[in-house]
Amino acid sequence: MATRNAGRGTLCVSWIGVAKFFLADWRLSCIFLVPPSVVLYFVHSSKGLLFLLSALALVPLAAILGGATEELAIHAGPAAGGLTNATLGNAPELVLGFFLLRAGHIEALKASITGSIIGELLLVFGLAVFLGGIGREKQVFNRVAVGASTTMLVLAVVGLVMPALFDLSVFGSMQPGGAATERLSFLTAPILIGSYFASFIFIFRTHRDLFRSPVRASAQVTAAATLLVLVVCGGLIAFESAVLVGGIESVTHALGWTERFVGLFVIAIIGNAAEHSTAVTMAIKDKMDLALNIALGSSTQVALFVAPLLVIASHFTQHRMSLVFPLLEVLAVVISVTVATLVSFDGETNWFEGVLLISVYAILAVFFFYSPAA
């Protein structure tokens, strides 16, 4: 009897932890939008309305999935936890990207990848530096960790620039659908993914002392409850992503926007909204190492893991995707990586540097808004 009561007590504590997890984050206030979006989908409501509801519903779902992934990473330990964060942490972007790929929205898909990278490096990094720097002369952070992230982003730039340069030098124009380019992209993708996972050996094995957190977090929820949250949340993200992709054409026609702009500044922001707020919150608390790890780490994950993985996945669908991005998007990524590197190379930031980062993002947004479809 005592054992049975102990088991019930453990189960009760577990689900109390789940409840606290759901109530602790203001981003989860949008979770009430999930049921209406499901109901309206099955009654065949307006696709524009469904696009809006599903976009807003993805924000809390991404936050829940991110929190559950961190809980699972704590249970798994430092090394395995890093691998868990690398894979499951990108689930919202991967799921949304897969549905865009399956629907043939290649332009929007590539734009969302570009938008995620420049959004993290300029908008999120900029907001974190600006809001964190208010009332402080400067904020300092680990230069080694940031240096590793920016170096990996340079590799991502090489992976994006070389396919485009190949097309320009061989064919005289950028043809993202060419057989040769698709083959080269397919061969380049595993190299980018391999380099990304090699970084975990650097962080968690050979140079772990440089990246060790001063405080080790403890799990708040049992592993079983965490896995259940991951499964349910993953299914809902897949559903909402499918609904959102189905409404892209309606939104572009109604608002007069291009698929490129929607991908760059709507889908990209939605997919990373949960991480955006976390990075800014950490910076305000003067935890710049965590803030920069989120901003720079997320852009690295998208460039070296999400994008090449979608390239490989496209070879198993009807719509092929290459690493040849439109020239304006490639230039935007190069500019973003350059500016972010210049701001972070000295290991300290101030609020004015945040203003500069946000200004660059705003300039890019203006030019992309008025640029024609790719």
Please state what every model-predicted region is:
Residues M1-G67, L121-G246, L255, F325, ...:
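Alpha-helical transmembrane bundles of multi-pass secondary active transporters
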Residues R27, G81-G133, V262-M321, I335:
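Helix-loop-helix junctions within the multi-pass membrane cores of secondary transporters/permeases
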Residues K47-L61, A76-A86, L255-F265:
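Loop-to-helix transition at the N-terminal end of transmembrane alpha-helices
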Residues L101-E107, Q175-G177, V251-L255:
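Membrane-interface interhelical loops and short amphipathic "cap" helices
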Residues C233-T278:
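Long, well-ordered mid-to-C-terminal structural blocks that present hydrophobic/aromatic surfaces
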